[in-house]
Amino acid sequence: MENNPYFKYLPLVPTKGELFTIKAPDLEVDKILNKGFFCLPLGNALFRVGATYNWKDLTYETTENGKSELLEKIDSLLTCDYEIIDHKAGIRPTVRDRRPLIGLHPDFPSLALFNGLGTKGVLIAPWLANHFSDFLENKSPLDKEYDLRRVKKRK
């Protein structure tokens, strides 16, 4: 976002995160689990599990530290056997106050933003997408907690 001329004033911070895809045939869960990390059912005994936080290493490479952290988190929640299918790393936009930014640009209202969901995106994205859609289509007010107008644009 720092190179985006319209939204570069927003306090988005790049954060590296690592996650696993695991296979756990004995884990019978059909909802997202959240215990300081998420476990998202994908179907066919596959689950996406994550994520880690790293503000210094902004590469797309997986790390042994990330792997160890994820294994520790999984083992604190799951009592069944599992197999690691995939280990990935990526960069996600986060906001210092950990609240996503949604809304219309203050000077160019035809530009909309839906960003900064961070790791909680997996949990909040469905509700926030409906909320934003209602705002765009029905002119319903945005929740102040997520409205990008909470960030003052510097002149």
Which residue ranges define each predicted feature?
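Active-site substrate-recognition segment that forms the wall
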Residues: 1-109
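C-terminal catalytic lobe of FAD-dependent flavoproteins
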Residues: 83-155
